[in-house]
């Protein structure tokens, strides 16, 4: 079973970094087309500098942004003693600092991890998750989230969110500028460049979204594997995933920007079954359970 779960872990990490590199190439390509069309290299420099600034901002404030969007509130050990002690024990086993714990008042069972590194990590769970799962299942979910922290998934996931938004915004600006100012260039070369630019600007957000979804699905499978290794009881996480998937109602506060951070789609299990796998933020539950149980 262990070999079945962990064989592709290192391969998935390599592929993820390749996808991240592709994101930066998209940004540079957009800036290049725009700078070439207007004959100004400063536009490309602006794109590069602005993308770096956005990534720095996301690094320092990612946890605050995500927690604000989710409506999570920090709790004390006395308020949720069992939850706190389970996470505390797993953190010791994983060799990680104890993350801060946040709770979301929502009946939909779900959880996520955020923060810029293991020393500034946060694990958030819904009240529905706490009431639905038994201790071994809760350990499985928390082990999954700690694996995101240990695997440094949180920062990568946040950067993906920022880059998808950045590519979409710049593509929109690029498309509008080419359409409204395309008449200024009547020569054949200018028209060809405008056509290429418009096609690229329209398609790049779509490909950026696909990259975001691909990274999310790979990271979830990796965290499942690492979480099972941490608890040494993959059946606990498998049972938890099955219970979570059977809850069909969406979360009260959900944002597509952070949907991929959750252990399950916040839109609910019913919605997830109706959309195609290509646009799903998470791998199919059946696939995840099969991988865990071997």
Predicted regions and their residues:
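Polar-ligand-bearing catalytic/cofactor-coordination segments
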Residues: 1-24, 36-37, 43-45, 50-194, ...
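Hydrophobic, membrane-inserted alpha-helices
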Residues: 27-31
């Amino acid at each position: 079973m262990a070999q079945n779960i962990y064989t592709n872990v290192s391969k998935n990490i390599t592929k993820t970094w390749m996808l991240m590199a592709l994101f930066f190439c998209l940004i540079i390509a957009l800036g290049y087309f725009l700078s070439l069309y207007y004959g100004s290299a400063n536009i490309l420099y602006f794109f590069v500098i602005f993308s770096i600034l956005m990534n720095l901002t996301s690094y320092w404030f990612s946890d605050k942004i995500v927690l604000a969007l989710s409506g999570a509130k920090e709790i004390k050990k006395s308020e949720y003693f069992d939850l706190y002690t389970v996470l505390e024990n797993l953190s010791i086993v994983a060799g990680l600092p104890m993350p801060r714990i946040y709770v979301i008042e929502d009946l939909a069972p779900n959880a996520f991890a955020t923060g810029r590194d293991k020393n500034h990590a946060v694990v958030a769970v819904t009240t529905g998750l706490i009431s639905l799962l038994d201790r071994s299942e809760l350990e499985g979910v928390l082990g999954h989230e700690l694996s995101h922290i240990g695997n440094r998934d949180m920062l990568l996931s946040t950067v993906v969110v920022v880059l998808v938004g950045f590519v979409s915004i710049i593509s929109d600006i690029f498309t509008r500028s080419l359409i409204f100012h395309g008449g200024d260039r009547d020569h054949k070369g200018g028209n060809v460049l405008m056509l290429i630019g418009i096609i690229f600007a329209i398609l790049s957000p779509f490909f950026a979204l696909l990259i975001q979804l691909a990274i999310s699905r790979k990271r979830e499978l990796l965290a499942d594997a690492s979480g099972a290794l941490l608890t040494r009881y993959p059946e606990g996480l498998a049972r938890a995933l099955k219970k979570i998937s059977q809850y069909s109602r969406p979360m009260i506060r959900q944002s597509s920007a952070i949907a991929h951070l959750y252990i399950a789609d916040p839109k609910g299990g019913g919605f997830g079954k109706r959309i195609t796998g290509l646009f799903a933020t998470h791998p199919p539950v059946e696939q995840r359970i099969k991988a865990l149980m071997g």
